[in-house]
Amino acid sequence: MYSIDVPFEYSSQSVSYLEGQLREMVKMLEQVTGKKMDEDKLKEVIKRENKTHAYMNRYIDVLRYKCHPTTLTLEMYMLFVTHTFMGTQQTLRFFEILMDEMESFPDSKAKRVFWVHIVPFYPHGLKRYFNYSQHYEVLGLDLNFDYLEEMDCDNPYRALAIKMILNHGNGPYQRKIGSIMNIIDRLQPDGVIHFCQWGCKQSVGGMMLLKQMLDERGIPFLALDGDGADRRNHYEGQVNTRLEAFLEMIGKRERCL
């Protein structure tokens, strides 16, 4: 096992420190497996990731006004292509197809919500309101847009180190707020829902800071407490009551475009 220490702050020194760890990890894997790392293939992966990021940024710009039929589960499962399989030909093709589809969709007339943190997959109330709905649409999860910058494919280890440090899940919570607000400025949602997973300090601990920023912008905000993994800790009635009140509130507001 090799444990990577990702620095909290971003600086030239912290990037070099993390880059050194990545190179050391590769050497360890080469010794264990008896296989040599092909850096040219790694560079090709970074190139595909850059192409994918370009499609993702186009997707965000089009999503601002286009209708995009989706479900909460599909948005959560998109984490596989934006993280686990990022840099593969399949992920690049996924976003190429998605962009082709988006061009054919009509402009949206629904009230639109941006989701922060994970989506619980089992609550029927949430599914009833958002899945393939003509009235309320989920524009996406912040987790899928946590790093969209172009990477230096000629220096893949350093590029990966920068990506890991600047990911909005790392470092001060202000970094995450800045990343989320950047996406919100581009998507212009009618409201934001933050799911606060029980025991998740990364999300619950900074939630009020995000709420304060959204309040200053006049963007409606709803925090839903729950457990995305264990339905026994989910209170359907309470969640539905708060969600319905929130949707009624944004329903009375003029569209934010």
Can you annotate each of these PLM segments?
Residues 1-39, 141-257:
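Trp/Phe/Arg-rich N-terminal binding region typifying the photolyase-homology
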Residues 19, 23, 27-150, 169:
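A charged, amphipathic alpha-helical module
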